[in-house]
């Protein structure tokens, strides 16, 4: 049996943030969500989250995971104290306990699988991840005997100058035999420079302690401040972009772009500089994004062009052109072969196939049919000061420049609306409508 405990109780004071450290985003996911993601394939019987500082925020952010058991650590008195809080929850449990940190987000599932396999085959009391670092500052040092058994781990702040020269470090990721661990947990003390109860002190109390060295030390990098957060963001972005370039996506200037891990691409996609994808995005074959576009939780079909535009929670059809400087807001559906031009805003609207809204227009809460032409400066006036109202325009209709359609309103098919008109009544099919005040012209002599 396998139980997994993720430590997420710390204050994260070096982040200088009101947000709990484990909730800071990294390539679109919180740190702790990333840690949870690498545990799914391990098929644990239990997953426990140790919370403390701003516990409610952390718990609320993880409600989508139905199998989590939250354990409160109050006060936060060290990693050993955190694991002591698990004893009532794991009463009667007979198996392995994998201990992870909520601020170590780059771990791979494969690494944890290898750790578990090594631990079980070695019949160890505890096995933990380790690494040899050229610059081990900040990490506890691992000390072994001639046979390779771990004798002790000393936290850096408690090391002598000579002990600090040791480059073998503890990554803080442990696999314990729970029964053996629970027998020694109450023997831990806080006799150290921090007056905290260290989980590392269990190493010298257990029968057989081993370490398992990781292939890629960056995988165990913890995040304590925003500099380290930025370093991890850069690392993930490089991984993501390299992956998609190997699958047929071109980045003109990769370093200036960012992706979310939930982004998916077809082939022959070109991504120009300063383009960013956030949340869950699906980008079809042959799309050309940017420069300067931001796409969030949206689906773009094939051969979509999006230049200097914001697309948020929208669906864009094949062979559609967006921008430059267009804003497609949530719940919008732009059908194939359409054009949304410069300085156009679309909000919660369906735009039919082949429809063109080329410039300087606002279309909100509307349903437009196919092959419609919306003239420059056309506005759907959807808000009466209290409620939003719908505008419907049927196929093959046209609006002249500077038209205002006052919702609720329905414009029929094959309707032409003259420039400068303000329309507040429904218009039947095949109509020509011009509604504007008569010009009054006077000479200066008058």
From Swiss-Prot:
Catalytic activity: alpha-D-glucosamine 1-phosphate + acetyl-CoA = N-acetyl-alpha-D-glucosamine 1-phosphate + CoA + H(+); N-acetyl-alpha-D-glucosamine 1-phosphate + UTP + H(+) = UDP-N-acetyl-alpha-D-glucosamine + diphosphate
Cellular compartment(s): Cytoplasm
Keywords: Acyltransferase, Cell shape, Cell wall biogenesis/degradation, Cytoplasm, Magnesium, Metal-binding, Multifunctional enzyme, Nucleotidyltransferase, Peptidoglycan synthesis, Repeat, Transferase
Pathway named in the protein's UniProt entry: Nucleotide-sugar biosynthesis; UDP-N-acetyl-alpha-D-glucosamine biosynthesis; N-acetyl-alpha-D-glucosamine 1-phosphate from alpha-D-glucosamine 6-phosphate (route II): step 2/2; Nucleotide-sugar biosynthesis; UDP-N-acetyl-alpha-D-glucosamine biosynthesis; UDP-N-acetyl-alpha-D-glucosamine from N-acetyl-alpha-D-glucosamine 1-phosphate: step 1/1; Bacterial outer membrane biogenesis; LPS lipid A biosynthesis
A Gene Ontology cellular-component term: cytoplasm
Taxonomic placement: Bacteria, Bacillati, Cyanobacteriota, Cyanophyceae, Synechococcales
Binding site for UDP-N-acetyl-alpha-D-glucosamine: 7-10, 21, 73, 78-79, 140, 155, 170, 224, 329, 347, 362, 373
One Pfam family recorded for the sequence: Hexapep
UniProt name for this protein: Bifunctional protein GlmU
Enzyme Commission number(s): 2.7.7.23, 2.3.1.157
Claim: Protease is one of the keywords in the record: no
Subunit structure: Homotrimer.
Keyword Isomerase: no
